[in-house]
Amino acid sequence: LHRSNIIYFMNGDPGHFGPNSMMWKVNKEITVLFGGARALLMHAAHPLIAAGARQTSFYQRDPWKRLIRTLSLQNSVTFGTIEEANDSATRINKLHEVINGEDEITGGYYDALDHEQLLWVHACLQLSSIYFYEKTVRKLTKEEKDTYHEENILSAKLVLIDIDKMPKTHEELKNWVVKKLSLIHISEPTRPFHI
């Protein structure tokens, strides 16, 4: 059990979602952690996300540190008390404030608080979690996927994604990612982290 699950049973704080939510049902599965690794590789293939990660030198020093932070945030937001979830999101948002600049490879501008870049990171993790859940547990109905997406909109809001500009359904989010894939490529600095 996540530490916060124990707190929930002790003090009745279900956090933002609670044990009957799709967020709990999907994210409690250990195999969903593989979704985090898949998402990390998708993040690294995005030239501007990779540029921001290079600025913090996560890829050079410890390529999995970013994954651990991302999964920690996902766990806190999903299973934590409201205070834990909000505090975790605030810490990440503070960290993101200083990650910005010009990508020396593409000339593009990266900004860890940019809506499109935040949405790419969020969408990759959300879709990868569903992907591994369906590969290892069971297929989800369209309604379940849409409920998971709707619940994820709150987690997106916590990390300052403009939810008014977010795709409204699971399928719309999936289509948005597919459309963005045409812009994605592996750059030399991130090649060591791809399979």
Identify the residue ranges that each predicted region occupies.
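Alpha-helical support elements that line or immediately flank enzyme active sites
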Residues: 75-78
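Extreme N-terminal leader/anchor segments
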Residues: 1-33
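Inter-helical turn/loop segments and adjacent helix faces that build the functional surface
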Residues: 131-147, 159-163
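Flexible glycine-rich active-site/ligand-binding loops centered on an Asp-His dyad
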Residues: 149-155
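Basic/polar, acidic-poor N-terminal "presequence/leader" segments
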Residues: 26-64
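Small-residue-rich helix-loop
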Residues: 170-179
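A glycine-rich, hydrophobic loop/mini-helix early in the fold
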Residues: 60-66, 71, 82-128
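Single conserved hydrophobic/aromatic residue that forms the stacking wall/gate
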Residues: 184-195
